Swiss-Prot record:
Keywords: Activator, DNA-binding, Ethylene signaling pathway, Nucleus, Transcription, Transcription regulation. It comes from Arabidopsis thaliana (Mouse-ear cress). Belongs to the AP2/ERF transcription factor family. ERF subfamily. This is Ethylene-responsive transcription factor ERF117. One of its GO terms (biological process) is ethylene-activated signaling pathway. The gene is ERF117. Gene3D superfamilies: AP2/ERF domain. Residues 86-143 bind DNA. PROSITE patterns: AP2_ERF (PS51032). Residues 71-86 have a biased composition (Polar residues). One of its GO terms (molecular function) is DNA binding.
Amino acid sequence: MISFREENIDLNLIKTISVICNDPDATDSSSDDESISGNNPRRQIKPKPPKRYVSKICVPTLIKRYENVSNSTGNKAAGNRKTSSGFKGVRRRPWGKFAAEIRNPFEKKRKWLGTFPTEEEAAEAYQKSKREFDERLGLVKQEKDLVDLTKPCGVRKPEEKEVTEKSNCKKVNKRIVTDQKPFGCGYNADHEEEGVISKMLEDPLMTSSIADIFGDSAVEANDIWVDYNSVEFISIVDDFKFDFVENDRVGKEKTFGFKIGDHTKVNQHAKIVSTNGDLFVDDLLDFDPLIDDFKLEDFPMDDLGLLGDPEDDDFSWFNGTTDWIDKFL
């Protein structure tokens, strides 16, 4: 049987052993017991007091001890063995090598990394495998956070609301469709706003007061023609009782006239042109003979005779000439 001992000694921790004696060279003999010396046997001689000798021995501290015993049947461990290691995932085998293993987060079980001769190599294998798992976990997390940009954006259905509006003649029930903007990925609100503004500039609309008087209108690209409803206009005039407007009858048709002079007749159908300046100027030339007979002080507009040709397609002056209609309505 072959046995060997492995010891680990810490030189920083030293124990001191003190050895105390009277004669470090003393031996066991009969002469040491003799207390009488000389010719006179009765004379006693006092022995000298013994000296005290102190000897110190310094011994280092033993931290751990391994004792292995080998025989024909195999190796058996004798004493306590340390199987754990200072590195995570590394364990020491009974025969002195180090095993490394790591937990697989995807399969929920341990993965064997192998056996290494040194503790550092086993720890390095553990860290390498841990980095691989961390990279795979990061990629999986990024895939979950990705959004599919190829899918169309969702658009809510428009909501309809009934609104009752009061006008000068009658109550109008309108169904208003609330515009819902699209939402989701890839939607830009700036482009939507620019499209709405450009559409408003391309399609001119009448004011609400003119639309209520003359009814629905057909909107064209360049001109807006308003169909004149004589019966509805007569009812409005009768309700407000204008002093300078009266109803005249010529044959079976009903026309409008003004109390200025003996005779003044206005055609039954009037056309209002808002965007074509040339047509409006031609209409004014047709009315010049009638305007000469009118007393302009009866009208709230003083610049009717001062109207000229439009410059640079600016028709803002036309809005001023129709303000008297809104005023009396």
